[in-house]
Amino acid sequence: MNIIELNNVTPAAFADISRIASEVWQSSLAFEKGKKYLVSAQSGGGKSSLCAFLFGYRADYSGDIFFDKRNLRDFSVNDWCLVRQRQIAYLPQDLRLFGELTAWENVSIKNEITSFRNDSEILEMFRKLGIEDMIGKPVGKLSIGQQQRVAIIRAL
C-alpha cells in the first residue's frame, strides 16, 4: 500500500456538527507510505475512530477512505485479512496480550499466521526495544511499558 486517502470523512458521532474543527474530518487528506504523521486531538476528537476505520473495525462514517485508490467499503472479509496480515498494523489501547504466555509466544502467535519475520529479525526487535531479557517471561509479569513494547513488536 502506497497511499491512504480520506475524502470528506465524518464519523457518525459527528454527523450533526456542520463544521468540525479538524484537519482530518470533513477534508481531503492523504497519508503517503514512508512518511510519518502525528494525529493529535483532544479527548473525543476521533483519534481512535480514525484507527478503527483504517483497520476495518468500524465503518460508521460518511465520506470515503481509500487504500491505493480502492474504497474501503468495497473490501471483502478476505481483503481485510490480507491487508491486516501484510500492510497495516494497529496497536489498540487495550494491548490484547495473553498474560500467561511469554513475550516470545505472544509475538510468535501472529508471526505463525503471517510468516512476516524470521526469528532473528524478531529477536533483533526485542533487543532494539531493550526487552531481550524478557523474552521467556510471562507477559502478565511484565510492567505495562514492557507489555507495550511486546505489543509493538507483535504489530510490526
Indicate where each model-derived feature is located.
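ABC ATPase nucleotide-binding domain "signature" region
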Residues: 38, 150-156
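ABC ATPase NBD coupling module
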Residues: 72-89
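Conserved ABC ATPase "signature" region
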Residues: 117-134
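Conserved ABC ATPase signature
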Residues: 138-147
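A short, flexible loop at the N-terminus of ABC-type nucleotide-binding domains that lies
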Residues: 1-6, 10-29
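Short coil-to-helix segment of the ABC ATPase nucleotide-binding domain corresponding to the Q-loop/switch region
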Residues: 99-109
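Helix-to-loop junction immediately C-terminal to a conserved catalytic motif
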Residues: 55
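Conserved ABC transporter NBD signature motif
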Residues: 63-72
